């Protein structure tokens, strides 16, 4: 009788969960949002923005009402857009950042930081080449309103001051920009963003030495922010200080290699720098390296076409432009990439649409086709198609139309 009662007690214990069966596997600890947030912060500081985004996305899944997590995710998503080379990729990153910033304000409308980061995100989204001039102006106005809301909630918010300075710079309100970035430097000199924006203000004012100085301070704080190295290199290139420019582009490439990021942008920057100096062999080598890192990116094929055109390798430029602008199959893309096996990997490309950022590729492609035209080929047929597309969208742009008209004249069309 005692054994029966004992058995019933044990059975009830199993059913209620008070008694656990022997030899159960040790339960795996459940990760907290804070664990993912800390991981994301580390990835961001290291410079691996892709992994940082993934970690913060996990953190927001576990704690969806944490405005700070959404704001930080938005910040990183927007900065990741600086490491994209196509309009579509940039826009996708910026729109993802805007969705995260909107969520931050939604869950914490009284948070100064939430409004500050939303201002920053709106400003970066206000790119006329991506969203059109009218929409860009609307976004700039909204960005200004968000920055003012952040400062109304917390007048001492240094990041809000800095973001307002960046917005003011994009509005060409330079006196206001200088005033607010000076305030930000006093309030938050430890922030990478503050020095980056001070550098941007100086660069806009063509104070290039001061801009470089501030950008360098920004990477002193966060040494693996490769897009800032690219900004420094571009200023040196503008000043025709070629060794310094290439040094900073090479540093960006080296950092990416160390942290395992396959980013073609440093190699594209190196290639363009070599092209400007007339070193086309070195430029082509760097373009091919960029292609090996991102073989599915049509913008890289287009930039390779530009290098070939500048080097007067017109026969090489045509297939590169064709892949970039019209799309191509795995065999054609392999030909452009100079690979051994079209199926390893098998890369098919969509064409880049005509836009403010790609029109230079289109008219260069058309010019190469018309310039190589010989009786009996169809190069002029293709060239006229390209020029007609350009004319339909940019017929009022005199500079572009001068180039188009030269090509049309060659092909006997006016």
How should these model regions be labeled?
Residues 41, 75, 79-82, 120, ...:
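Residue-level recognition of tetratricopeptide repeat
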Residues 33, 67-68, 112-116, 158-159, ...:
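Helix-start (N-cap) detector for alpha-helical repeat units in TPR-like alpha-solenoids
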Residues 62, 107, 153, 187, ...:
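Structural marker of alpha-solenoid helical repeat scaffolds
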Residues 45, 79-80, 124-125, 170-171, ...:
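Register position in tetratricopeptide repeats
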Residues 31-62, 79-90, 159, 163:
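Alpha-helical segment of the N-proximal tetratricopeptide repeat
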């Amino acid at each position: 009788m005692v054994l029966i009662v004992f058995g019933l007690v044990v059975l009830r214990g199993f059913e209620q969960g008070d008694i656990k069966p022997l030899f159960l596997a040790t339960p795996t600890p459940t990760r907290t949002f804070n664990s993912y947030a800390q991981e994301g912060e580390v990835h961001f500081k290291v410079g691996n923005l892709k992994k940082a985004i993934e970690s913060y996305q996990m953190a927001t899944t576990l704690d969806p009402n944490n405005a700070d997590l959404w704001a930080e995710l938005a910040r990183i998503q927007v900065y990741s857009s600086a490491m994209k080379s196509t309009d579509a990729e940039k826009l996708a990153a910026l729109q993802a950042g805007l969705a995260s910033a909107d969520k931050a304000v939604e869950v914490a409308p009284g948070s100064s930081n939430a409004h500050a980061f939303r201002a920053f995100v709106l400003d970066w989204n206000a790119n006329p080449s991506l969203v059109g001039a009218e929409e860009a102006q609307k976004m700039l106005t909204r960005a200004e309103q968000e920055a003012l809301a952040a400062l109304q909630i917390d007048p001492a918010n240094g990041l809000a001051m800095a973001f307002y300075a960046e917005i003011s710079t994009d509005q060409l309100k330079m006196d206001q920009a200088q005033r607010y970035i000076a305030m930000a430097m006093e309030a938050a000199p430890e922030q990478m963003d503050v020095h980056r924006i001070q550098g941007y203000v100086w660069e806009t004012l063509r104070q290039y030495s001061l801009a470089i100085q501030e950008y360098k301070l920004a990477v002193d704080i966060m040494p693996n922010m490769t897009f800032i190295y690219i900004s420094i290199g571009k200023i040196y290139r503008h000043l025709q200080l070629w060794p310094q420019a290439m040094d900073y582009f090479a540093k960006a490439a080296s950092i990416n290699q160390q942290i395992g990021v396959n980013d073609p942008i440093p190699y594209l920057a190196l290639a363009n720098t070599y092209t400007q100096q007339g070193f086309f062999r070195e430029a082509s080598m760097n373009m091919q390296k960029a292609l090996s890192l991102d073989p599915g990116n049509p913008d890289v094929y287009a930039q390779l076409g530009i290098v070939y055109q500048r080097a007067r390798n017109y026969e090489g430029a045509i297939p590169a432009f064709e892949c970039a602008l019209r799309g191509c199959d795995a065999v054609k893309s392999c030909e452009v990439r100079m690979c051994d096996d079209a199926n390893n990997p098998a890369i098919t490309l969509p064409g880049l649409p005509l836009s403010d950022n790609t029109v230079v590729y289109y008219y260069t492609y058309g010019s190469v086709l018309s310039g190589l035209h010989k009786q009996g080929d169809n190069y002029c047929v293709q060239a006229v198609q390209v020029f007609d597309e350009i004319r339909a969208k940019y017929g009022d742009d005199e500079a572009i139309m001068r180039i188009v008209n030269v090509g049309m004249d060659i092909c006997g069309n006016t």
